Amino acid sequence: MSSQNSFMSSKKDDKGKNIQVVVRCRPFNQLERKASSHSVLECESQRKEVCVRTGEVNDKLGKKTYTFDMVFGPAAKQIDVYRSVVCPILDEVIMGYNCTIFAYGQTGTGKTFTMEGERSSDEEFTWEQDPLAGIIPRTLHQIFEKLSEIGTEFSVKVSLLEIYNEELFDLLSPSPDVGERLQMFDDPRNKRGVIIKGLEEISVHNKDEVYQILERGAAKRKTASTLMNAYSSRSHSVFSVTIHMKETTIDGEELVKIGKLNLVDLAGSENIGRSGAVDKRAREAGNINQSLLTLGRVITALVERAPHIPYRESKLTRILQDSLGGRTKTSIIATVSPASINLEETMSTLDYASRAKNIMNKPEVNQKLTKKALIKEYTEEIERLKRELATAREKNGVYLSNENYEQLQGKVLSQEEMITEYSEKIAAMEEEIKRIGELFADNKKELEECTTILQCKEKELEATQNNLQESKEQLAQEAFVVSAMETTEKKLHGTANKLLSTVRETTRDVSGLHEKLDRKRAVEQHNSQVHENFAEQINRRFSVIQQTVDEYSVKQQGMLDFYTNSIDDLLGASSSALSATATAVAKSFASVQETVSKQVSHSVEEILKQETLSSQAKDDLQKLMTAHRTGLEQALRTDLLPVVTAVLDLNSHLSHCLQSFLGVADKIDSHKEDMNSFFTEHSRSLHKLRLDSSSALSSIQSEYESLKEEIATAQSTHSEGVNNLISSLQNQLNLLAMETRQQFSGFLSKGGKLQESVGCLQQDLDLVSSDAIECISSHHSKFTEQSQAVTVEIRQLAGSNMSTLEESSKQCEKLTNSINTICQESQQWCESAGQKMDSLLEEQVCYLHSSKKQIQTLHKDVEDGCGSSVVEITDRVNVQCQAQEKALTSLVEQVKDDKEMLGEQRLELNEQVQSGLNKVHVYLKEELRNDVPTGTTPQRRDYVYPSLLIKTKPRDVLLEQFRQQQQEYLESICSVISEAVEPPVEQDSLEDEPPVAVNDSVISEKSCIDLSMTCQEKGGVPFFQQKKALRKEKENRGNATLLERSKIMDEVEQSLPKSKLPLRMQN
């Protein structure tokens, strides 16, 4: 394909060259701005495109794009147009080519400005330097510069022709009368060229003369003011520049090279309604538009390669004949307006320019003339002019008046035009005849070929008819077999419908079962998913509770450590205070000792006197004390020690129970996922157990409180008795009082420990029971057996705890009874000892009265000496009490805070347990999905369907039946035909139409064959369609007769010779 394109392009280059088309758009003028017109043109100089917006302003789709050789926008300058368009053409003119540049477009778009230009208003520029100068002055200026640079001999001749109202005028004529019309003739040397008789050619020697010539021609040219342009050109102008250049060959021969440049400024097309032209201006506009319309038709004919080009319809096109499709290099400058009010004229101009781009010229270099040939031509021209001059002087030739001469010349011109037109028509007719002859020969060959093909086709038709006859017989047999198969097929179709209905029912039932299984599967999947989620949540919840319990145990351990440290600090402070008090007391006793030592010596004598009396009393009192001690020891050993051991055993047993409860709690934690059914019963039983335990412990606490009160009363009574005894027996009874106080403090400490152990036991029981209740209430298990086992174990532990509490209460009762007996015995002993001591006291009264004064004086001295020390000790004790009170207050506050924190922790655990219970309820009541019956599951039933299929008879049996039916139908039809025979036809009618009778016999013979075939075909028709088949046979028989007659007529027509008329006559 590429080689073919290259070949075509090379062939195109050999044939010629397209006309160069340039588009120039001028800026907006004042009239367009006043009319508020917008721009409809977009000039792309780089892409050489002009885009016209044919729709509204915002319509992006209504655009049309044209592509040209060059495009100049409104900002383009005169020098830019000249350098791009004219400079290359000027070089070709100097090379010897004929070139043409003409401006085309609407009036007022800048054609004259482009070709001629204007003079600047300040007149400080020369023609060649003026930025407003057009193509014509710049071209002549550059011609002289280039020819001067080359250095050859040259001559330049210019002419300026005006075409006004289809008349030719010479604008450079020396006569002042511009109205002299010029005549135009065909150039005999150039078939496409013209000669204008009387056109003045002026030789130009320098550029200054050129500018004078241009000014003179512009002054004579027809211009007028219209609404479109104040200086509108009313005529076409053709400025021709002919250059003769001298060349010398290698051999020394002198040649003359001729180049010609035509610069054409066309008058603009205009809308008379818009331009406001009337009368004379309207006629001018009509002639201008007529010539431009002819130019457009010439361009269209050249583009479409029409056989006739209407050059002679206008003088403008006759002058431009060689430039349009001839041997001249042509460039067209199309000037347009960007305003929307001139859109129609702009589109028309661009369409003409786009079509003109396709015109093909064949530029040729002008033949170079030798000096001798040119001199010979000039000599012949001089001789011809001399003869015409001599004839005019001598009046020997033919003399005609001007009117006759002009009339004769007009006839000659019209005849020449007619001859030209007729010659063109003759040439066209000859080409048409030649084309028709070739077409006739081709048709004749095709006819011969068709005849041979027709003969072959007739032979093939005969063979095909024979084959058709055989095929009909086979078709009849096959039709009978097919009809039998159709009946079998219908029966099978009914059976298949029954089977399909059964299959549909079974399929519907199976789909219902599958839907039931899908629903079951969906419920199971949902429950398994919910179960997994519930297990994960419960594990997560118990791990959180376990973590919380660990944190709380750590916090409680911290609280215990804090309490221990606080008590240790308090004990340390107390010990330090006691040590300080002891030192102060020692100092006071040291000061008192001095005073007492003075009286001791005096008292020794008196004590020695009383020693004898006290010794006897001492012995009696020692006897009583030993007896009382042994009694107390025996009572303590026999009564209190077993109770204490029993209480200790009870404490260990309760600790063991606590450990067992902890083990049970661990078991409950291990089986927390298996408890489900007996949640309420376990909660109630544990709650009852906790109440019983708390009531028992409260009873123990009350008994302990009563025991403590009794011990306190006993201690107070004993202390009173001891104080009474001390007053009489100071030194002897101090030891007894100390021992008794130690014993009672031991009892109280043991009782406090017992209370602490019982309180801890109660707290532990409360914690264990509450933990058990919370754990059991927050976790429902599915395995009831393990829950029952745990319940039995808890009940056993509860029973053991109850028995332990009963034993503890019994031991406490025993302890109370023993303590009461001891107190009674002590009271009796005290009474007996008091009676004995009364006697002794009476004896000592006298001595005491005597010693009283001494002791009082000593007492005063001791009081005076110990007053200061007592005050000091009191102050220290007060300070120590205040410090201990502060410490105890802070400890009490800390205990309250810890108690509140424990309450908050308990509430938090209760909330977590309650949330776990809620999740369990949600799991059991909401998340678990039940399989709800829908009522669409199919029931079991029996299906009824046919089990046997019908089979068609064998082919041999069917064919035998077909032959029998065919024989029967043939016999019946032959009998019907014999009965329906028509009467004999008259001889005259037979003699009148002999060929038709022959044809009828042939037709009847063929119809009999067709009838037999139809009978055979009818044999295969089912019995319920045989009547319809008979009616169709009659219709087919008539159709067959008509078809045979038409075939015979066609054969007769083919046998007759046909007249072969030429195609021209038929047309």
Swiss-Prot record:
Post-translational modification: Phosphorylation of Thr-937 during mitosis controls the association of this protein with the spindle apparatus.
Modified residues (Phosphoserine): 1046
Any one biological process term the GO annotation gives: mitotic spindle assembly
Keywords: ATP-binding, Cell cycle, Cell division, Coiled coil, Cytoplasm, Cytoskeleton, Microtubule, Mitosis, Motor protein, Nucleotide-binding, Phosphoprotein
Cell compartments where the protein resides: Cytoplasm; Cytoplasm, Cytoskeleton, Spindle pole
Keyword Cytoplasm on entry: yes
Ranges in coiled-coil conformation: 365-480, 692-721, 882-915
SMART domains cross-referenced by the UniProt entry: KISc (SM00129)
UniProt GO cellular component terms: cytoplasm; mitotic spindle; nucleus; spindle microtubule; spindle pole
Self-association and partners: Heterotetramer of two heavy and two light chains. Interacts with aurka.
The protein's name in its UniProt record: Kinesin-like protein KIF11-A
Phylogenetic lineage: Eukaryota, Metazoa, Chordata, Craniata, Vertebrata
Gene: kif11-a
